């Protein structure tokens, strides 16, 4: 029986990411590039990962760090959402990638941005939701139940203490 693709597409590797790994030009969507890059991590294909970064990223200079990230024990990929960007040459893919390290399971969540240039899709950058600050839970309270301490930051967003601003 043929091996299933590491990207979790439920297709065989030969009919899925191997096509992209053989020739970058075979990638036709940002999601396909993201899945093939994940599979390249699983399979240890450092060159493919480096070559599918956008040239402006100078990934060759970061080859050692990329190789280290590939050494993780990648377990599972979940594509959360794929969407078109501001035009047909930009796309975003949000995903969860699970890996084991030092006997613990971790989940990396990223919203990756891809751009198409000269007919080829490239990874250019990504944002990590855990890097974004958590919203203040008081912002979700109804006005009637809002409790603000006198020394808390003002709810108007001025940065002043509540007692010196709107309090």
UniProtKB/Swiss-Prot annotation:
Record protein name field: UPF0225 protein VV1_2912
Coiled-coil regions listed: none
Superkingdom of source: Bacteria
SUPFAM superfamilies, A to Z: NTF2-like (SSF54427), Sec-C motif (SSF103642)
Record family assignment: Belongs to the UPF0225 family.
Disulfide bond annotation, renumbered to this chain: none
């Amino acid at each position: 029986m043929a091996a299933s693709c590491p990207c979790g597409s439920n297709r065989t590797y030969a009919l899925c990411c191997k096509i992209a790994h053989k020739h970058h030009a075979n990638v036709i969507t940002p999601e396909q590039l993201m899945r093939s890059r994940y599979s390249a991590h699983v399979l240890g294909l450092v060159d493919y990962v480096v070559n599918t970064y956008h040239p402006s990223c100078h990934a060759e200079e970061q080859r050692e760090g990329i190789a280290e990230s590939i050494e993780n024990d990648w377990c599972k990929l979940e594509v959360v959402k794929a969407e078109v960007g501001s035009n047909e040459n930009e796309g975003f893919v949000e995903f969860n990638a699970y890996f084991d390290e030092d006997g613990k399971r971790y989940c990396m969540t990223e919203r990756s941005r891809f751009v198409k240039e000269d007919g080829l899709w490239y990874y250019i950058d990504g944002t990590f939701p855990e890097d974004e600050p958590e919203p203040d839970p008081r912002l979700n309270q109804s006005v009637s139940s809002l409790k603000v301490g006198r020394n808390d930051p003002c709810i108007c967003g001025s940065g002043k203490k509540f007692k010196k601003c709107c309090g």
